[in-house]
UniProtKB/Swiss-Prot annotation:
A motif (PTAP/PSAP motif) lies at residues 109-112. InterPro entries: G_retro_matrix, G_retro_matrix_sf, Gag_p12, Gag_P30, Retrov_capsid_N, Retroviral_Gag-Pol_poly, Retrovr_matrix, Znf_CCHC. Residues 134-144 have a biased composition (Polar residues). It comes from Hortulanus murine leukemia virus (HoMuLV). Residues 159-173 have a biased composition (Pro residues). Residues 440-481 form a coiled coil. This is Gag polyprotein. The keyword Protein biosynthesis does not apply. RNA-binding phosphoprotein p12 is phosphorylated on serine residues. Gene3D superfamilies: Gamma-retroviral matrix domain (1.10.150.180), Human Immunodeficiency Virus Type 1 Capsid Protein (1.10.375.10), Zinc finger, CCHC-type (4.10.60.10). A lipid is attached at residue 2 (N-myristoyl glycine). The modification Phosphoserine is found at residue 194. One of its GO terms (molecular function) is structural constituent of virion. Residues 145-155 have a biased composition (Low complexity).
Amino acid sequence: MGQTITTPLSLTLDHWRDVQRIASNQSVDVKKRRWVTFCSAEWPTFNVGWPQDGTFNKDIITQVKIKVFSPGPHGHPDQVPYIVTWEAIAYDPPPWAKPFVHPQLSVSPSAPSAFSHEVSGPPTRSSLYPALTPTKSPSPKTQVLSDDGGPLIDLLSDDPPPYRGPENQPPAGRPTTTMQEMPRLPLKVPQEPSPMASRLRGRREHPAADSTTSQAFPLRTGGNGQLQYWPFSSADLYNWKNNNPSFSEDPGKLTALIESVLITHQPTWDDCQQLLGTLLTGEEKQRVLLEARKAVRGNDGRPTQLPNEINDAFPLERPDWDYTTPAGRNHLVLYRQLLLAGLQHAGRSPTNLAKVKGITQGPNESPSAFLERLKEAYRRYTPYDPEDPGQETNVSMSFIWQSAPDIGRKLERLEDLKSKTLGDLVREAERIFNKRETPEEREERIRRETEEKEERRRAENEQREKERDRRRHREMSKLLATVVSGQRQDRQGGERRRPQLDKDQCAYCKEKGHWAKDCPKKPRGPRGPRPQTSLLTLDD
């Protein structure tokens, strides 16, 4: 007999009870059929290195988890319980899985990860202020001298070549300018580059005496003291515009994109205008700017109507802010905050509760995905925030009433429904959704119900036939009884008792003075036999 090959997938199937116990500890429910489908058919298509037989490699599991938890239409909420359970097995393996779990290798600092591992929770809103990071003084470097005694440029050094002035043309694709032409705000470059941070602004920090300020500048100081600047590349703008819906179609998604650009790239006033002009139409841009100016607050913290304060905080013309000073940086930070507020307010449509009620759960849509669409409708068509605890009751009722019919009926029958939170309802809806029958099970149920219906119809037909025969037999019996009764009455009618006679009256001629035996009118002779009466039988 040949030996069987043990794979992570077959190992989990052999210990399925332990897998279900681990899933229960994670407050999720998993099914074996979907477990096999996701592992062997779905996750290999994510192109992150997931094999069809499964793996316990934590890095690959993390990449799959990032794909599953992706927001919007690119996510896979129905696969969340399965990848969470798989991750739990990899990070806390049971005894049968320990020999197959890969040890966690230390990651080299030169290979930063594009994403953070913790993605299960909702992303927190980042601040628009540049983060302050301490810097370390680098070790002294040896210089390589050229033939004329001057230092050669190290192409792998921390700094790009210095800006030589207007007499030299900048390299193609990387336009440069001087500080006098375009002042810039210091930018903090994250240790792990974001996929969106493709602007070549330099990714290393300069040493400085003050360790409490950000040292990653979009305007880099070269060897001759001049600053260098890299604006948005045309590829960035093209990708952002073509890979995202328009502001009118999905304002939430485009607002999230612009917010991430404001955080990761920290653009200047000119960059913001270029970004808005590329991603928004003229009418959309005007609406955003108008809402942003409405959000300007005065010294008392309330929205102001003073034109000078509005123009100072959110100018429509290019300001003369000096980004090398704290005042200039504060102006730019406030401008970004107001711009983000304008995007959020301009993205809200007029209040239309009918649009919210029109959001219903699809036949194969998971409750988590349906809840996200419902919350997005609340944000877009109502002035209410679905994340506000005061609106949780309204969102919960909409979730129950607009869920799929089978899920909604079971949610309405829950005990102590008033005390259930929205999270409790979603977990219960997920449990009901995961216990739904598969298409094969549905076909089998329909076939079984059809056979039972045919059997009942056949039994009813047989019962009706028996009842019809029984009724026909009763009618024939009644008819026979009627015929027999009529014949008996005829016979009794011929033999009816004669009327009462007097003592001297003849019974034959009814005359008085003699009896019937002496009646002269009565014929004399032998008496013949009486006629026989024929009876009708059932055979006749």
